[in-house]
């Protein structure tokens, strides 16, 4: 587990964030440039469910799945689950690695209409995903006669919290 590695490393109380690096190649081909380096707050890094894996189904982890090591951070976007893991950096500030700033893997800090451009300071790093929902019945465009009662079906989910009710 990631937690075990961090405990073995004797993480200092000043730790705020981790930074994860993989063996990805930068699109420019320049080996001096980092393709992507995501991270998580130290409290999330210490979660029991985060894994550093080297096997899948009793076999060495396939290259396409992140061989030789992959970090798995359940409940957060897949981009945080670093493939081809080469380094974990414990930071005393929010990690500012490649793809942690600007519009990369970020979302508005507050609700906005689609297409609205926001300054970088109004964007936040995507962490756990918000509740999402989908109506599966009736189909889009179905006309329901006024006064007719129907059952609405669908799904609601979230990455780290339980959904216990849905208001329609």
Regions found by a protein language model. Give the residues of each.
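Structured, non-membrane catalytic/scaffold regions adjacent to prosthetic-group chemistry
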Residues: 1-168
